[in-house]
Regions:
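SIR2/sirtuin-family catalytic core signature
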Residues: 1-32, 41, 48, 247-329
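N-terminal non-cleavable signal-anchor helices
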Residues: 11-14, 43, 217, 223
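Conserved catalytic core of sirtuin-type NAD+-dependent deacylases
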Residues: 20-59, 163-166, 170, 176-194, ...
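Extended charged low-complexity segments that act as oligomerization/scaffolding linkers
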Residues: 37-77, 321-328
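Generic alpha-helical secondary structure signal
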Residues: 39, 55, 74-77, 151, ...
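Extended, H/D-rich, highly charged conserved domains that either
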Residues: 56-231
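A Trp-anchored, charged/polar loop motif used as the substrate-binding/catalytic surface
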Residues: 143-153, 239-257
């Protein structure tokens, strides 16, 4: 009986009291004057004393993303969308041309052509795969100790009634506001693995059919090429947040949100990008009293807020909208 009582006492309070959900994006950290903007990341990998892997990544991103990479108006959501549009098709076509030589020139060294085919794609694989690691290296340089709490935001939080879903990797909530009911959905410093990138996870795999090859071609060479072609797909996916898989991984968390009697959803610095909307859709679908919910945006950008309202309506949000003042000015 004691165990049952403790279960009800601890878990019952946890499930019944939570009435506030805060959804936080990068604008939240930037409102605390933390250098976590896209431009800050670019400045980091452009610095003169950057190690070679960061310089190589910079050149690589310029090549595959183009001039917008340097645009001062470029935001994280723009960067993520551009990563999703990265086109390796020319590199793959070049490889397929080299593959053709494997069987067109049967009198030549197939291993030589195999190497020529896979070398450029191997480079793509290694450089693209470095992005998450370099990103994490950068985010670890952000000094949260320099941030000060925003009192207008702090006053919104009702003790033991608030839960936080953050898309940030920093521990701003934990260290500046001493909050513990925090879910870092894309990972965090000194926490779960960090997810960064676009949302276009590939299921397809590039391969070259062995029956098209010259019989004299070494099967090991063909296997090497196919392995590297698959690696290009893996490199593209290393730039992706596999949202579908991440939702499955965090199914328990989203189930717990459904158990709460959420009455207010506060949104601070979150951009409602298509990539992250599957999470928001799950939240909307799980609200107990959808018509009575207030979805409350930071008043930082009213034009953006009106766009967000339209996005939420399209995703079947039936409640009302409001604003809160997000600075102490």
């Amino acid at each position: 009986m004691l165990c049952i009582y403790l279960f009800i006492l601890v878990y019952g309070v946890m499930f019944l009291v939570i009435e506030q959900l805060f959804i936080l994006g990068n604008g939240f950290d930037m409102a605390h004057r933390l250098p976590t903007g896209y431009e800050d990341f670019v400045d980091y990998i452009k610095r003169e004393d950057a190690p070679d892997d960061e310089k190589i990544l910079l050149d690589f991103l310029i090549h595959y993303i183009g001039e917008p990479f340097y645009d001062g108006d470029f935001l994280w959501k723009d960067f993520e969308n551009k990563l999703g549009e990265a086109d390796f098709s020319q590199d793959i076509s070049n490889t397929e041309y080299r593959e053709d030589q494997l069987y067109d020139d049967a009198d030549k060294d197939s291993d030589y052509y195999a190497y020529q085919a896979i070398a450029p794609l191997s480079t793509i694989k290694h450089i693209a795969a470095s992005l998450p690691y370099i990103f994490e290296r950068w985010i670890r340089t952000v000094d949260i100790d320099k941030a000060k709490p925003i009192e207008n935001f702090r006053r919104l939080i009702r003790q033991n009634q608030a839960t936080f879903l953050t898309f940030n990797y920093t521990k701003t909530l934990e260290e500046i506001y001493r909050e513990s009911h925090v879910k870092h959905i894309h990972g965090a410093i000194d926490g779960e693995k960090i997810l960064v990138g676009h949302g276009n996870h590939l299921d397809r795999v590039h391969t070259y059919e062995k029956d098209k090859m010259n019989p004299l071609t070494e099967l090991s060479s063909i296997d090497d090429i196919n392995y590297t072609l698959r690696s290009v797909d893996a490199a593209y996916n290393s730039w992706s947040k596999d949202i579908k898989q991440n939702i499955i991984k965090n199914a328990g968390y989203f189930a717990s949100l459904k158990a709460y009697d959420i009455k207010e959803v506060y949104s601070f610095g979150f951009s409602y990008n298509d990539i992250d909307m599957p999470y928001i859709k799950i939240i909307i679908d799980g609200l107990k009293n959808p018509c009575n919910i207030k979805w409350i945006f930071s008043d930082y950008n009213e034009d953006a807020n009106q766009r967000y309202e339209r996005v939420l309506r399209k995703n079947n949000f039936k409640g009302i909208f409001a604003r809160f003042h997000s600075s102490d000015d």
